[in-house]
Amino acid sequence: MADLQKQENSSRFTNVSVIAPESQGQHEQQKQQEQLEQQKQPTGLLKGLNGFPSAPQPLFMEDPPSTVSGELNDNPAWFNNPRKRAIPNSIIKRSNGQSLSPVRSDSADVPAFSNSNGFNNVTFGSKKDPRILKNVSPNDNNSANNNAHSSDLGTVVFDSNEAPPKTSLADWQKEDGIFSSKTDNIEDPNLSSNITFDGKPTATPSPFRPLEKTSRILNFFDKNTKTTPNTASSEASAGSKEGASTNWDDHAIIIFGYPETIANSIILHFANFGEILEDFRVIKDFKKLNSKNMSKSPSLTAQKYPIYTGDGWVKLTYKSELSKSRALQENGIIMNGTLIGCVSYSPAALKQLASLKKSEEIINNKTSSQTSLSSKDLSNYRKTEGIFEKAKAKAVTSKVRNAEFKVSKNSTSFKNPRRLEIKDGRSLFLRNRGKIHSGVLSSIESDLKKREQASKSKKSWLNRLNNWLFGWNDL
C-alpha cells in the first residue's frame, strides 16, 4: 500500500486517492465524532456567555484535535471539510432605513446619541429631538412626564422643512371655547340639563352672569353660535335709540321736473339706490326688488313715514346717507325725454316747490291711491325756525294747483353748474307782429312798408304790368 501511495503521489493526479476498504470504517467513525463535536460546541459557548465556568474556547475552530488531524491530513483537498464556526447568541438590532426621528435605545449601557457612525443625525426633513429643548438626559427613560412633554413638543415645535400641521387655529379656538368654563352653557336651551320632562327649557339664574359676559371666550370661528337673549335685547334697544335719535330729514331728497305720467317709474328708479321709508304702493307691488331694499327692523316697518308730493315733485327719505349720496348723482338725467332734477331736502326748497305760506300745511297725497286720507290720520306740521312741530290747530286741507307751482329762477338751491340755461330766442325769427322790432329786422320791415306805400301811389300801366308778371307785391 505504501508503494502504491508513493507512486500516486509522484503522478500528476496528486489530489486523487484510492480509499481502501479497511479505512472506510475509520472514515465513518471520524464523521460521527465530527457531528458530536459540532453539537457539543454551541452548548459550551452558551454556558460561557451565561456566566458558567468553562474553559475559554475560540469562536472559530481552526483545526480539530491532534488525534484526528493526522487522519484529516490523509483526505484530499476536494473532500468536504467545512470550517467550524460559532453562532453568536446576542441579536443586533439594525435599522432598515433612515428614520425621521431619533430612536431611543432600550439598553442603558449603550448611549442614545451615538453619532460616530453617522446614524440618528438631524438631517434634512427630520424633526428635532424634543429633549433638546427640555434639557432631558438621554438615559432618563423611565419618567412618564418626560414622555408627555416630548409628545406635546413634537406637535407644537415645528421645523421649517417638515409637513404642515394637522391642527389649525380654528381647532384650538374650538377647544378653548369648549373647555374654557363650565358655566358658559348654562342658558343653552339645547342642553339636556336645561330641558324638563314637558319639553320646555328651564332658565337657571346664574349669580356670575356679569362676570361671565366679560370673561367668556367668544368663539368667532364657530358658525353655530347664537347670541343670548340678553345681548339680543340690548342690541334691539340700541337700534331703537339710534332710530329715535337720527334725523331722517337729513337723508331725504326732492325729485322734480317730471310729468305725472312717469311718476311711478321715477319712484322705482330711485328705489334701486336704497331703502325708502315712505310707504309707496308702487314699491310694494313691484316684486322684482332686491331683498336688501325690504325693511328688516320692526320699529321702522311699524312707523309709516308721511309722503310729501305735489304736481311734478316728490320727497323721498332714504335709510342711509350712502343711498342719498348715490341718488343725488342722478341730478340732470333725462328719462323719457324729460330732464329730472334731484336735490337735497330742505324746508326752504319744499316751500318754494309748493309755494306755501307759513300758516299753510303740506298735504299728504299718494300717487296711486284713489281715496283721500282722513284729517285724523294726517300728522300736521308747522315750520318754526326750520323744524317741523305738531300743530294744535285743526287740519286745513288744500290742494296744490298748477298755478301755485312756481319756482324762482334765481334760487340757489336749484342751480347746477353743469346744467344749461335756455334763453328766449324768439326775437331772432321774423314774425308778422304789429310791434316795432329793433335792429336789422325792424329796418328791413320799415323799408318794405315804405316801398309798398310808394308803389300804391304810382298806378301806371308799367307798374301794373310788372306786378302782374313778377308779382312783387306777393313778396
Curated annotation (Swiss-Prot):
Modified residues (Phosphoserine): S101, S297, S438
Protein keywords: Acetylation, Cell cycle, Cell division, Membrane, Mitosis, mRNA transport, Nuclear pore complex, Nucleus, Phosphoprotein, Protein transport, Repeat, Translocation, Transport
Biological process, per Gene Ontology: cell division; mRNA transport; NLS-bearing protein import into nucleus; nuclear pore organization; nucleocytoplasmic transport; positive regulation of DNA-templated transcription; protein import into nucleus; protein localization to kinetochore
Repeat region (FG), residues: 124-125, 264-265, 273-274, 470-471
Residues modified to N-acetylalanine: A2
Membrane topology: Peripheral membrane protein
Record's compositionally biased regions (Polar residues): 7-17, 92-104
Region (PSE1 binding) location: 405-438
Listed Low complexity bias regions: 22-41, 232-244
Major site of localization recorded for this protein: nucleus
Residue ranges occupied by any RRM Nup35-type domain in the UniProt entry: 247-352
Gene Ontology CC annotation, any one: nuclear envelope
Required for nuclear membrane association and proliferation as annotated region, ranges: 449-475
CDD domains registered for this protein in UniProt: RRM_Nup53p_fungi
Alphabetical list of PANTHER family matching this protein: NUCLEOPORIN NUP35
UniProt comment concerning the protein's domains: Contains FG repeats. FG repeats are interaction sites for karyopherins (importins, exportins) and form probably an affinity gradient, guiding the transport proteins unidirectionally with their cargo through the NPC. FG repeat regions are highly flexible and lack ordered secondary structure. The overall conservation of FG repeats regarding exact sequence, spacing, and repeat unit length is limited. FG repeat types and their physico-chemical environment change across the NPC from the nucleoplasmic to the cytoplasmic side.
Annotated function: Functions as a component of the nuclear pore complex (NPC). NPC components, collectively referred to as nucleoporins (NUPs), can play the role of both NPC structural components and of docking or interaction partners for transiently associated nuclear transport factors. Active directional transport is assured by both, a Phe-Gly (FG) repeat affinity gradient for these transport factors across the NPC and a transport cofactor concentration gradient across the nuclear envelope (GSP1 and GSP2 GTPases associated predominantly with GTP in the nucleus, with GDP in the cytoplasm).
Protein name, entry field: Nucleoporin NUP53
